[in-house]
Amino acid sequence: MGASQSTNGPGQKTTSVEELSKRLAYRFANKCFTPLELTHLKDNFFSRALDQGGIRYWNEEILSEFLGIPDGAGSAAYVTSDGSLDAGPVIFRMVSYLGAFPFHNTMAPSVLTFEAMVKVIVLLTERYGKVLKRGRKDRVKLLFGSLADVGRRDIVVQLQEAAEDSLELIGEAGPGSDRTFTHPTGFSVDKPAHDDDGEEDDDDLALAALESLDAIEIFKHDQRIDKTVYESKISINTFRRLLAFLMVTAPLRPLGTISKYTTGLSSSILETVNEQVESILAALALDDLEGGIGYKSFSELISTSLPYLFDPLTPLFEHLLFSKNLDVTRKRHSQSQNDPAAKPVPTPPSTPPSSPPLSPVILNGGFDSSILNPTLLSHLSFFLSTTAQIPNIFRNRTRLHPVFSSTEHGESLTSFSHHVMTWQAPSILLIKGVVTSESDEEQITTIGAYLPQPWKQSSSNSSRRSSDVPDQSTLPCLFELSPVHTVLQGSPSLSSLKPNMPITYFSTKTGIAIGCQIPPPSRKSLGADFLPKPSGGGSLLIDPALEVATLVISDGLNGEGVFLPPGISAHSASKSVSCTTLAASTASISASNHNTTKSISIYSLEVWGIIPSQSLSVQLDSPGSFVEKQDAITQQRAQWDFEAREAERRKVINMKVGVGELEEHSGRALLEMAGIVGDSQYSGLRHLR
């Protein structure tokens, strides 16, 4: 690994691949870290590094201990006997691969030196956007390579062969030799393969980083070592262990304590985690994945339905950028105690702050959820975006307010209307129930929808121009959390849909409809012609009694609609030149277009209101003046107070329409028949349409 060289010709300077890798790491450090962060990183690394032959490095034990990653024995199970998650070997395999960037054929697995650690931190945190040409797309490729463990030869044998090949090739190369570059080969998984998915090679993402180092030719030769096709995959067990680790650490904040989430977990929590992990694995159709998960399946899953899966790695590896040994605040506090006369010195603003207390995402009050729990919330955070600036719901301090529960408030559209129609903010609908199969077996199912607009304004999407490419937080989302993870993203062409295709629709006669085509009102409409029709990639219908929900998922049979078919992202769909083109592309997804319909017997239905990080935001109302916007909770309570006052006002209406007692009784009878007073007074039921 340390003998690879490039020979540019007689009398010219010889540059090794390792030297180029170090120079690239320094570029990464200067571009992605502040001087203070580098100081903390150096202290953390070198104070714990092992020394062998003058090389300072970290091994798996040091990395796992510092980051607090469970590193138990045994590879068969991802949950150890003490309730911890055994993710240490998986994480170390990832960093050993990424530390060799971009010379994976030559250097992977790399020794975890300081230079390798710099590249690992950049690539595993959100700083990767500064160095990767295509951002998230390139990162998915790197993450797949770091996890792929099927199709690789035994590492020990491979390194021995690499060392022997290196010595032999260096001896053969000379001034008159045709061999321009000599270096050992790395993982066989990294040898170029002729994939059928149409993806570009990884050349672009590394060429941009190397163009200023005069190393492009070396990199290209590194990629041309062997043109033999090698199939590489991620083993199911490796991905399962990583998913479980990411599931429990999703709420991790910068400088937070990871052991708080990975140790001492109860059997019920571990069971819930396992259910959600198996749901995600089920989305990969494991029966068709013999030997592991290929790149195409991995890329489609991450890109279309789990875009924020690896977000927990950012706060995890940013622990390396803060050293307790250099905690200026603690040192000065200790000095002030020893010297009472010493004046307090303000902490420099560049000192890494301690992690602020984590505000609860799920707010108390209203009702105790029978659906939403911390594990389910972690699952939602992998694909649900509530703000454009910081998509992850744990990082952007989004809070969920309990709005409606069929268990607490009753299975009534009247109660649903009272609680939900008065909520003037985005919301999440969750449904838990059972699906009965043809063999009479009942299977627990959890589905839901993210609705970025208040229910009353379901048809007010005409303000969004069709030429704009909206972010995920402004588009609706229909999803299934279990038993099979499925995400149907909102169409970026909502503004061009017909008026009879609202995001949500509410009627006391037909119930609740999401992503459906609504028939025009007509006195002659009877039976099935009167019911909302499924459209687009997916639809959800709930009967007026809130007892049965019907989820329809289509591969393109229902044409255009509010939601895209599964496997299509809003970003890729936005490239379509028109709705006609989009409909044609969605219709060609499956060779045999079909609908999948699930009839779910509802156990519980809940609506959770989404509150942004700042419940009282200030916006510019007019030049020189500001208005304070009320948060959704205050608005809802004000609406309820108004309705209560109106009901009370109607009760005290002067019913004396005449001067005699007979006229008074007649007037009251008229008011009762009108439903203004008495037991039959207006219940306040609202219609969305």
Swiss-Prot record:
Recorded hits in PROSITE patterns, A to Z, give: TLDC (PS51886)
According to the UniProt record, where is the region Disordered? 173-201, 332-359
Q: From which domain of life does this come?
A: Eukaryota
Compositional bias per record (Pro residues), positions renumbered to this chain: 343-359
Provide GO CC annotations from the record.
cytoplasm
Q: Is Aminoacyl-tRNA synthetase included in the keywords of this UniProt record?
A: no
Compartments, record wording:
Cytoplasm
What keyword terms does UniProt attach to this protein?
Answer: Cytoplasm
Hey, which family's this protein in?
Answer: Belongs to the RTC5 family.
- Name of this chain's protein: Restriction of telomere capping protein 5
